[in-house]
């Protein structure tokens, strides 16, 4: 199974991806995580350092693909998860999306794709141009990371549009949303009422998740020392369990931009209607109690 993880930049895709990869590994799956971002920090919490990228390796080999071996580009991370970083061109030069395509090409030539139960692509921000949408060409499922905010859900809607477009010619489905760093899900629920799709999990705002990124460790590794963190790992295990069952998924029908903008902004601009509804609900509850 191949899984492409997308979401607004800075939403926590890489941290979430690494923990999902470990969760899948703990369920007995052989996992490869491919970082598709020029920052090449997708697998940092799995390996504890910034591993050399595909581009770094090709440069050292003078771009002789035939001289590249799997061990040159695949690094072992925590929990037995194998890691690859695509890398990218120098800032302001070249096309990062092209590098993603070349990474997939190289791994296929190395027959690396055939050795894993699950391949997870952790993809740059919410950029879904042709190059960075390339992982969707190979993926069985797309997973969108979001929070309960306007910008992240607006980005999720654009990604949903890309999934729908790719699903015309590829066997691709949207597995669903994962809410991250949010204690509420009211805006998420408002969005999925408009654009129906599953919500696999909603993780609350947990400081240890942010700290794990700084430490270069997954929550599972931190939980080996601090048993109180086991409950956080359960969120990721729940996501893994749902993915392993190969859910039916959906081909989403995204909301037009202006309609979605109006829908989500109204949630912020008209809080009185929300408060009023809560008051009505409470009055109805009081009558029921009487």
From Swiss-Prot:
Residue numbers binding [4Fe-4S] cluster: 95, 129
What's the top EC group for this one?
oxidoreductase
> What does the record note about the cofactor?
Binds 1 [4Fe-4S] cluster per dimer.
User: Among the record's GO biological process terms, what is one?
Assistant: photosynthesis, dark reaction
Task: List membrane-spanning regions.
Answer: none
- Cofactor section: [4Fe-4S] cluster
Keyword Chloroplast in record = yes
Localization of this protein: Plastid, Chloroplast
Pathway noted in the entry: Porphyrin-containing compound metabolism; chlorophyll biosynthesis (light-independent)
Provide the E.C. number(s) assigned to this enzyme.
Answer: 1.3.7.7
Family per record:
Belongs to the NifH/BchL/ChlL family.
NCBIfam families, alphabetized: DPOR_bchL
Known role:
Component of the dark-operative protochlorophyllide reductase (DPOR) that uses Mg-ATP and reduced ferredoxin to reduce ring D of protochlorophyllide (Pchlide) to form chlorophyllide a (Chlide). This reaction is light-independent. The L component serves as a unique electron donor to the NB-component of the complex, and binds Mg-ATP.
Q: What is annotated about its quaternary structure and interactions? A: Homodimer. Protochlorophyllide reductase is composed of three subunits; ChlL, ChlN and ChlB.
What name appears for this protein in its UniProt entry? Light-independent protochlorophyllide reductase iron-sulfur ATP-binding protein
Species of origin reads Pyropia yezoensis (Susabi-nori)
**What's the encoding gene here?**
chlL
């Amino acid at each position: 199974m191949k899984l492409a993880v997308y979401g607004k930049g800075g939403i926590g895709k890489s941290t979430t991806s690494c923990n999902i990869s470990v969760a899948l590994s703990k369920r007995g799956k052989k996992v490869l995580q491919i970082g598709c971002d020029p920052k090449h920090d997708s697998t940092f919490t799995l390996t504890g350092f910034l591993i050399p990228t595909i581009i770094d390796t090709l440069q050292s080999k003078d771009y002789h693909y035939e001289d590249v071996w799997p061990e040159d580009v695949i690094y072992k991370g925590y929990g037995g998860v194998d890691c690859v970083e695509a890398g990218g061109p120098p800032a302001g030069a070249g096309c990062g999306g092209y590098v993603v395509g070349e990474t997939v090409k190289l791994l296929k030539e190395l027959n690396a794709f055939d050795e894993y139960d699950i391949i997870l692509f952790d993809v740059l921000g919410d950029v879904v141009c042709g190059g960075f949408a390339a992982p969707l060409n190979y993926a069985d499922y797309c997973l969108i990371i979001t929070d309960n905010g306007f910008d992240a859900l607006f980005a999720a809607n654009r990604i949903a549009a890309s999934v729908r477009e790719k699903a015309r010619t590829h066997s691709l489905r949207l597995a669903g949303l994962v809410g991250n760093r949010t204690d509420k899900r009211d805006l998420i629920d408002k969005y999925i009422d408009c654009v129906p799709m599953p919500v696999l999990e909603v993780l609350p705002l947990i400081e240890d998740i942010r700290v794990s990124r700084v430490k270069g460790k997954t929550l599972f590794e931190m939980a080996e020392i601090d048993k109180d963190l086991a409950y956080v790992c359960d969120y990721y295990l729940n996501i893994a369990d749902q993915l392993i069952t190969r859910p039916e998924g959906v081909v989403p029908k995204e909301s037009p931009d202006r309609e979605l903008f109006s829908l989500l902004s109204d949630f912020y601009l008209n809080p009185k209607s929300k408060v009023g509804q809560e008051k009505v609900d409470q009055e109805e509850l009081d009558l029921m109690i009487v």
